[in-house]
Amino acid sequence: MEKENIRLFGLCLAFLTICNTVVLAQYIPQEPNYADTTMWITRDGDAEGTGADVFYVVSTWEEDWTTENGSVCHFADVRNPVHRRHMAIEINRAADYMAPGNRFYAPYYRHTTMETWMTLNKDTIANRCRLAMGDVCKAFDHFLQQRDPQRPLIIAGFSQGGKAVVELLKHMKDETYSQLAAAYVMGYKVTPEDTAACHNIRPAQGDSDTGVTICYNTVKDVKYIQPVIAQTCMGINPVNWRTDATPATLHDTITVTLSPEYHVLVVSGYSGSEYKPYKGFLNVGDIHSCEPWLYSEQIRENMQLRSRRLAKKRGR
């Protein structure tokens, strides 16, 4: 019996060693250096110097991938030309409507892959996002060191980038928060745990309050809410800036109504067919991929309004 126990112990030890080897074989890309200008996409659309500084965080673009030596990676590589090109597609499209009248800054970062989110496992997502959010916080700190603190500040992000906005609100000091015109969490959730952890997360109540968080997620029906992304405790309609169920008309044919119970936008008259379903996970009744684009005109105008309101409050 004693020999059998020793043999089993040896097998367990070998198994743990194998498991550890698997963990060690996972590849972590090199950390970005945010003093390097190649780690950023920036645009200066503020010739008069009267606009805001917009810090934008890109969403999830990469799937799990394998290095040449067979190691699996769950993160984007900011030095991989293909990964950079993917992130740049979204960043440049966001800059097209966020940069005019403002100064726009967006870092490349080691965002975690789609497979991470598809696990639907809170611990896995939290553990892998820790590295990604660490990159974003470091980029934000570098950005703060360079910018004029008298200018209004806007932070915005889509999907995983929306999660980053929530984490930045927790990360920023009160002095930085006092410079915040608004934070835009597009296509991601704000949870009761988030609001309990951070007094700087305050839901927007209208179109012009400042220092607030604008959060929205779009679905065809509340039954399509994806909990890992959109089970939120706050929401506002970016078409009429209401927090009740008053419907709004967008582009003449689309009706957008906030569900006060679920805090998501329910749309009718819009199929979202340009956004193909992704592996049964996204765009399957939710219209996740539309978030930064469907309401872009309203978001652009709102950023300007809240920035002007904050500048007036601060005597600029």
Model segments located where?
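Gly/Ala-rich beta-loop-alpha elbow adjacent to hydrolase catalytic centers
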Residues: G157-G161, V165
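Surface cap/lid and interfacial helix-loop subdomains adjacent to catalytic sites
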Residues: A132-P149, K170-R309, K313-G315
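Bacterial Sec-dependent N-terminal signal peptides
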Residues: M1-Q26
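Active-site catalytic motif of lipid deacylating hydrolases and related acyltransferases
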Residues: V58-R151, S273-C290, S296-R316
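Short beta-strand element of the alpha/beta-hydrolase
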Residues: G51-S59
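Basic, amphipathic N-terminal segments that precede the first structured/catalytic domain
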Residues: A25-D46, T50, A76, N80-R84
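Loop/turn elements at helix/coil->beta-strand transitions in domains of secreted/extracellular proteins
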Residues: T50-A52, P100-F104, P149-P152, S178-A182
